[in-house]
């Protein structure tokens, strides 16, 4: 059965709750004070099953909202997730202040379907009823409640779905139900496969059940035993039971009035304005970039002004920071960042309402475009260009823009579902249809990838020019200089090697075919150093004396030493001792030959075998331990 959420709207005492009761048989006023005072204070709920014109059964969930100006904030908490609205206007009073404000709110929230009901029609004459009907038709002309906007060919009498009814006598109620069924049948079904999200509008406890929350499920499906995340706290909860329109169910799907029995959280930890959603996906935010519209009846809104911010059941104070403007004039739109006093779960496409800080009246609303704006300031022109793209483009183009604005840092795949409100399989599909570069689990724009690749190659080229005696640049040093993340850096290196723009040897990166380039005196000095150490055997020469006798300066001599050590021609045993590789190889052979007759050796025997002093013997034995030629056992070494 298709579920459609219907919201009421209208001035106080125009008969919204009585109309809902007459249609459904359910009194949506649940509070004792509401019944005593005869007015709706908080949002109430009812439901009705109706046949659509094609015979399909529809379940209408009514959200009845208060009409008093003092309770508009409660009205906003209920109307955020509706599919269609019933604008209620009393025939004996006509259009009143909250009629206008509620109607403005519906338009700002981009409600696209609904009807108008003239209640208390039995209290006026037929002539007066016709006058009110004409007044209302003019009031809604050009809006979503004017059917001429859908079918300009309709006659004047059929342009606006305005039905006169009396909740007391029952007159017109059948026409109201017929119109509701027709309009509800045209409401597109919400996406039950999307990521689930339930804005909480009521919290209470039930004896024998525990903590219960209710709300309109705006997307996805929630089942018994599901684990959900509570925003903005991030606390994990489990669904012990599900009710849909007051009846137990195995699951709730998008578009249904839903009650959840929760475990893992107390009633004190829950409140209206919080949101339950899928785990490990979303993040709460205190800043959103949006397209903000100001009502024609509002005063100009200045940059930096504070407003009351309402989205679904959430309410907080926000500071408006306009992009490239000092104010928004009445009836105009602008891009803005809304800085919220309290964090909440907001996603691209969410509609919101702003009300003047004081006096508190509705002045505008808009749509969230980006709920994860960068912490670092960007040029206003760049931000506006980005917001225009995500507002008007396809999901693939929106993803490309979100990746591009992060430059070479890229965007991690696991961040995209929360930032764009997409399932992971939908993200994978978008990536396949894009030109984005994938570096492990990070996406980078082709331009940023090319620019970063150019920086890497340029950095290696400059390193070679400054260090002709060094065979290559270490990966760690290179990544540090170009300031790239590990996965993007690895992706760039792999691509550069594939295209033969770089070579990688172990931990060294170099230009293709680039070896050590030596001048004649440098090559001669290298040969001298190697010969001196080879001739010395285990009796290491004084390094200072060796370097002092060369034809090159000390800096180049040290680079030559580094090259010999890197190529393992010379081997550093300790900070002070360097040996030729041949000397150490001969020492290994001596120890292996000794093993047949003497499997163990102490320091004294080692000194006798090698002819070196204790100063050299200890570091050499420790080196042999590290190389697993010997193993120390007490004061002796076992030859392995």
Region spans (language model):
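Conserved catalytic-core segments of large NTP-driven translation/proteostasis enzymes
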Residues: 121, 138-299
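Residue-level recognition of beta-strand microenvironments
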Residues: 11, 203, 220, 242, ...
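C-terminal effector modules of nucleic-acid-centric enzymes and ribosome-associated factors
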Residues: 124-128, 138, 265-572, 580-631, ...
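Conserved G1/Walker A P-loop phosphate-binding module
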Residues: 1-65
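Conserved nucleotide-binding/hydrolysis micro-motifs of P-loop NTPases
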Residues: 68-69, 92-96, 120-125, 167-171, ...
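Conserved Switch II/interswitch segment of TRAFAC-class P-loop GTPases
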Residues: 58-60, 65-70, 79-131, 546
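Residue-level signature of catalytic and energy-coupling elements of molecular machines
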Residues: 13, 19, 38, 62-64, ...
């Amino acid at each position: 059965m298709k579920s459609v959420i219907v919201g009421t709207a209208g001035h106080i005492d125009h008969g919204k709750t009585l109309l809902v009761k007459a249609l459904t048989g359910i009194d949506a006023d649940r509070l004792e004070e509401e019944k005593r005072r005869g007015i709706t204070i908080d949002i109430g709920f009812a439901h009705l099953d109706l046949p659509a014109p094609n015979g399909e059964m529809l379940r209408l969930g009514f959200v009845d909202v208060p009409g008093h100006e003092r309770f508009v904030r409660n009205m906003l908490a209920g109307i955020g997730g509706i599919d269609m609205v019933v604008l209620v206007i009393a025939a004996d009073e006509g259009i009143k202040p909250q009629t206008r404000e509620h109607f403005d709110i519906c338009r700002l929230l981009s409600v696209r379907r609904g009807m108008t009901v003239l209640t208390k029609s039995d209290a006026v004459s037929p002539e007066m009823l016709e006058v009110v009907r004409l007044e209302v038709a003019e009031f809604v002309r050009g809006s979503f409640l004017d059917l001429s906007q859908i079918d300009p060919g309709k006659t004047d009498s059929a342009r606006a779905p305005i039905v006169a009814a009396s909740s007391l006598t029952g007159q017109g109620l059948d026409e109201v139900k017929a119109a509701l069924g027709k309009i509800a049948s045209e409401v597109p079904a919400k996406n039950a496969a999307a990521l689930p999200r339930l804005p909480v509008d009521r919290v209470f406890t039930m004896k024998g059940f525990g903590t219960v929350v209710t709300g309109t499920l705006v997307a996805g499906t929630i089942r018994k035993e599901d684990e959900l995340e509570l925003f903005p706290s991030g606390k994990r909860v489990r669904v012990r039971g599900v009710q849909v329109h007051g009846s137990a169910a195995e699951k709730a799907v998008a578009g249904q009035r839903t009650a959840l029995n929760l475990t893992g959280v107390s009633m004190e930890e829950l409140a209206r304005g919080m949101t339950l959603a899928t785990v490990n996906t979303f993040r709460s935010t205190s800043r959103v970039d949006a397209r903000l519209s100001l009502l024609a009846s509002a005063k100009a809104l200045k940059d930096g002004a504070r407003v009351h911010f309402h989205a679904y059941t959430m309410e907080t104070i926000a500071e408006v920071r306009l992009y490239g403007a000092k104010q928004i004039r009445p009836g105009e739109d602008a891009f803005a960042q809304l800085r919220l006093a309290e964090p909440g779960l907001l996603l691209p496409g969410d509609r919101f309402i702003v009300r003047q800080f004081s006096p508190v009246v509705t002045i505008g609303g808009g749509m969230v475009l980006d709920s994860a704006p960068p912490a670092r300031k960007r040029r206003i022109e760049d931000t506006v260009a980005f917001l225009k793209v995500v507002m008007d483009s396809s999901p693939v183009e929106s993803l490309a823009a979100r990746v591009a604005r992060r430059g070479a840092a890229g965007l991690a795949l696991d961040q995209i579902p929360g930032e764009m409100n997409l399932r992971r399989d939908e993200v994978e599909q978008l990536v396949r249809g894009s030109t984005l570069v994938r570096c492990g689990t990070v996406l980078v724009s082709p331009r940023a990838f090319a620019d970063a690749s150019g920086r890497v190659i340029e950095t290696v080229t400059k390193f070679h020019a400054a260090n002709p005696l060094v065979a290559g640049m270490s990966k760690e040093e290179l990544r540090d200089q170009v300031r790239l993340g590990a996965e993007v850096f690895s992706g760039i290196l792999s691509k550069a090697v594939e295209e033969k723009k770089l070579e990688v040897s172990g931990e060294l990166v170099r230009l293709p075919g680039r070896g050590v380039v030596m001048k004649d005196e440098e090559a001669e000095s290298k040969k001298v150093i190697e010969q001196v150490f080879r001739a010395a055997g285990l009796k290491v020469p004084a390094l200072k004396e060796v370097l002092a006798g060369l034809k090159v300066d000390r800096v180049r001599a040290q680079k030559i030493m580094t090259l010999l050590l890197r190529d393992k021609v010379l081997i550093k045993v300790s900070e002070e001792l360097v040996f030729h590789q041949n000397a150490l190889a001969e020492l290994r052979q001596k120890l292996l030959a000794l093993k047949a007759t003497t499997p163990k050796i102490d320091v004294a025997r080692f000194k006798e075998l090698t002819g070196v002093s204790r100063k050299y013997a200890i570091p050499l034995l420790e080196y042999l331990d590290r190389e697993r030629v010997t193993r120390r056992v007490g004061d002796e070494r076992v030859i392995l």
